[in-house]
């Protein structure tokens, strides 16, 4: 079959055995069966010079394409801005990104479901204990930051309840399944300044990353994600969670992060997906010292999210790491629920960040956890009937 004419009647013959080319005797087209230019479905073009982009690198979630045309207007414009001292050095231009670069994403992170629930959770039908014991487990484990084994020991020593640490873990996972949809879909009435950062935890000794996005006005955690990599994909998912109740960005919107490259790339994808309604620049606070005016002005916001990281790491440290990513997911979801709805904050006059009328009616923390589970169940029913917000 001739690849150009796509007809069976075209007889092929070897044109040059050393190079492996094939010559069609009907249309006289020479081509290679391994690398055939006629089988390409599309080719990416540079928007500045219309030159075909070259495939440069393969990343986990995207492919990097680059315009290598030395006469490209984009390249020449950037080259004129390079310091002349660097041009005189050998490979001095390599300090800058001068060529047009395009990242072709292999996964559509804007179509992934944000409401995916953890697996292997037990049911709320109690065979040995009841919801009171479950609330005790959550209070000791999440509020007081005890490990699973110390939680089981506290129930035995203080309340005389014999329970294994694995059963405590099952209760926490079940509660997380119920509570997470409520926490993720709650409308936090955000302001116009968001701040973001990432930190790491250990799963069986391997680094896993936690992404946080905070509303600077109320200091609520409005976006979070657990990922096995530090790429742009989980950053997009955390941003989607933070933006899910916004039809467009507020005026004078600021998104403050560190100098990591995933945040500007994620912002580009939001503009590509939603247009001018979600067009924003990342204000990057780089380093630990105020070396420029941007760092000096926005350093307090960066310190705010860093304190959040330390607060979470303080509760995580007692766990001595996790066995799997599901355990990290349910632990983080419960901690965010506690931080946003149950934990008193000094800067808020020792009140919770988000007042929920139903939760304020409970006098004890045990009752608050049970009501959170109830609110989560109602949110799940609303999601099943399409009444909750569409996380896009």
Regions found by a protein language model. Name each.
Residues 318-392:
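C-terminal domain-tail junction helix/linker
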Residues 1-7, 11:
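Single conserved hydrophobic/aromatic residue that forms the stacking wall/gate
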